[in-house]
C-alpha cells in the first residue's frame, strides 16, 4: 500500500518535490489542494502537470481510511470506526462543544499500557499508526462537514483515543506539526491537547520541543500502591519519577498540566484519596488542573462502576477546599458506545461471530 501524502509535513513535501525535479512552489500548491480545498483525488489538482501528477499517484495515496461505522449521539457526538489499509480498526470521535468542533484521535492499533478499567487495552497493541493515518482522521471529520455544506471546521484536537501517544512519539509530533501548519488546517497549538499515561522520559522530551500544545496526564490515583494496581505503567514510572518530569515540563514551558482522573466507585473516589490528590499536586498548584471524569462502564471490566454523584461531589469539594483547580468533565455520547475502544471491541466481536456463523 502506498503511504498517505497526509504523512508529510509541508517542509517534507517541499523536500520531496525538489528531489523529484520540481520547484518548491509546486509543493505549496499541492499543500493548498490537500488542506484548503481538501480534494479527494490527485486528478482534481488542475494546476499540476500530468507528468508530476503521475509521480504523485505512483508515490502516494491521499486518504488511507475507510469508514466502517458512524454512530451519532443525541447530543451531536459522532463516533467513527475507520478501517486501515491492512484491515485493522481504529476509533475517532467528533465532539460538538460550545467553543468549536473537537476531534479525539487514535494513535495506535490497540494499547499495551494495561489500565485495568479501560476498553482500549482489551486488544493489545498491534502496531503504531503512521502520521498519515493520524492526520487522515482529522480529514475524514472535516470532509464530513464539507460534504454536508456545513460551514464548520475542526477547531480543537485531543490526542486521547486508543493507544499511548508518547509510545508513538515521532508520528504524533509529525501529525501535530501538520495540523498546526498556518498554510493548511491551521488548528491552533493551544487548541490541541496530547494525553499521556505517564511516560516520564517522553514528557521531558515533549517539554523541549518548544510547542504550545497542551499536555494532559492520565493520573487516576494519588498514590503508588493504588495507581500500580489499576495502571501497570506506574510500575515503570512511579509517581516520584512522573512528577519530577511534570515539574520539569512546567519549569521549561511555563504551561499548565491537566490531570485526568476517572472516578471509580469505592476504588479511587474516597475523601482520603481526594486529600492525597490535593497534597500530591500542591507544589504545582498554580499550573495544574484536575479533570474529574465520569466512568463509562465496560462489560469486560465489571469489577468497576461509576461513582455516584454524591461521592463525586464530596471528592470535588475537598479538592476545591484545598485550592485545587478542578472540574467535573461534561459527558458526550452517553447513548452510544461511549468508552474509548468500546465501539471497536464490539464491532470486532460481531465480525468474529459472523465469521464463525459463516463457517458452520
UniProtKB/Swiss-Prot annotation:
Keyword field contains 4Fe-4S: yes
UniProt domain Radical SAM core: residue ranges: 97-335
Binding sites annotated in the UniProt record for [4Fe-4S] cluster: 111, 115, 118
Cofactor(s) needed by this chain: [4Fe-4S] cluster
Subcellular localization(s) per the UniProt record: Cytoplasm
Annotated EC: 2.1.1.192
Active site: 91, 340
Reaction catalysed by this enzyme: adenosine(2503) in 23S rRNA + 2 reduced [2Fe-2S]-[ferredoxin] + 2 S-adenosyl-L-methionine = 2-methyladenosine(2503) in 23S rRNA + 5'-deoxyadenosine + L-methionine + 2 oxidized [2Fe-2S]-[ferredoxin] + S-adenosyl-L-homocysteine; adenosine(37) in tRNA + 2 reduced [2Fe-2S]-[ferredoxin] + 2 S-adenosyl-L-methionine = 2-methyladenosine(37) in tRNA + 5'-deoxyadenosine + L-methionine + 2 oxidized [2Fe-2S]-[ferredoxin] + S-adenosyl-L-homocysteine
UniProt entry keywords in alphabetical sequence: 4Fe-4S, Cytoplasm, Disulfide bond, Iron, Iron-sulfur, Metal-binding, Methyltransferase, rRNA processing, S-adenosyl-L-methionine, Transferase, tRNA processing
SUPFAM superfamilies reported for this sequence: Radical SAM enzymes (SSF102114)
Any GO BP: rRNA base methylation
PROSITE patterns registered for this protein in UniProt: RADICAL_SAM
Cystine bridges: 104-340
Gene3D superfamilies xref list: 1.10.150.530, Aldolase class I (3.20.20.70)
Gene Ontology molecular function, alphabetical: 4 iron, 4 sulfur cluster binding; metal ion binding; rRNA (adenine(2503)-C2-)-methyltransferase activity; rRNA binding; tRNA (adenine(37)-C2)-methyltransferase activity; tRNA binding
Cofactor note: Binds 1 [4Fe-4S] cluster. The cluster is coordinated with 3 cysteines and an exchangeable S-adenosyl-L-methionine.
GO cellular component, one term: cytoplasm
Pfam name, any one: Radical_SAM
Family to which this protein belongs: Belongs to the radical SAM superfamily. RlmN family.
Role according to the record: Specifically methylates position 2 of adenine 2503 in 23S rRNA and position 2 of adenine 37 in tRNAs.
Additional note from the record: Reaction proceeds by a ping-pong mechanism involving intermediate methylation of a conserved cysteine residue.
PANTHER family reported for this sequence: 23S RRNA METHYLTRANSFERASE, RADICAL SAM CORE DOMAIN-CONTAINING PROTEIN
Record NCBIfam families: rRNA_mod_RlmN
Protein name: Probable dual-specificity RNA methyltransferase RlmN
Gene transcribed to yield this protein: rlmN
Amino acid at each position: 500500500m502506498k503511504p498517505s501524502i497526509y504523512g508529510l509535513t509541508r517542509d517534507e513535501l517541499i523536500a520531496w518535490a525538489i528531489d523529484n525535479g520540481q520547484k518548491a512552489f509546486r509543493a505549496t500548491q499541492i499543500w493548498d489542494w490537500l488542506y484548503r480545498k481538501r480534494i479527494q483525488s490527485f486528478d482534481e489538482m488542475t494546476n499540476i502537470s500530468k507528468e508530476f501528477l503521475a509521480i504523485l499517484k505512483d508515490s502516494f495515496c491521499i486518504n488511507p481510511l475507510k469508514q466502517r461505522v458512524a454512530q451519532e449521539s443525541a447530543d451531536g457526538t459522532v463516533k467513527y470506526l475507520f478501517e486501515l489499509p491492512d484491515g485493522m480498526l481504529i476509533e475517532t470521535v467528533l465532539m460538538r462543544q460550545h467553543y468549536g468542533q473537537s476531534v479525539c484521535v487514535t494513535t495506535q492499533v490497540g494499547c499495551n499500557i494495561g489500565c485495568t478499567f479501560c476498553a482500549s487495552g482489551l486488544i493489545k497493541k498491534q502496531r503504531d499508526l503512521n502520521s498519515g493515518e493520524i492526520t487522515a482522521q482529522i480529514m475524514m471529520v472535516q470532509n464530513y462537514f464539507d460534504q454536508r455544506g456545513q460551514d464548520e471546521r475542526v477547531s480543537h484536537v485531543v490526542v486521547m483515543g486508543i493507544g499511548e501517544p508518547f509510545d508513538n512519539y515521532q508520528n504524533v509530533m509529525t501529525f501535530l506539526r501538520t495540523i498546526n501548519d498556518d498554510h493548511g488546517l491551521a488548528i491552533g497549538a493551544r487548541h490541541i491537547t496530547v494525553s499521556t499515561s505517564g511516560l516520564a522520559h517522553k514528557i521531558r522530551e515533549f517539554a523541549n520541543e518548544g510547542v504550545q500544545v497542551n499536555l494532559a496526564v492520565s493520573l487516576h490515583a494519588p498514590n503508588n500502591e493504588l495507581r500500580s494496581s489499576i495502571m501497570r505503567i506506574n510500575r515503570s514510572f512511579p509517581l516520584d519519577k512522573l512528577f519530577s518530569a511534570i515539574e520539569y515540563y512546567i519549569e521549561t514551558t511555563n504551561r499548565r498540566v491537566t490531570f485526568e482522573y476517572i472516578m471509580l466507585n469505592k476504588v479511587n473516589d474516597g475523601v482520603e484519596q481526594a486529600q492525597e490528590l490535593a497534597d500530591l499536586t500542591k507544589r504545582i498548584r498554580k499550573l495544574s488542573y484536575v479533570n474529574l471524569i465520569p466512568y463509562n462502564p465496560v462489560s469486560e471490566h465489571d469489577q468497576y462502576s461509576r461513582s455516584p454523584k454524591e461521592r463525586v461531589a464530596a471528592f470535588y469539594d475537598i479538592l476545591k477546599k484545598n485550592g485545587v483547580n478542578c472540574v467535573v468533565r461534561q459527558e458526550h455520547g452517553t447513548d452510544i458506545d461511549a468508552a474509548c475502544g468500546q465501539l471497536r471491541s464490539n464491532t470486532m466481536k460481531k465480525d468474529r461471530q459472523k465469521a464463525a456463523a459463516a463457517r458452520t
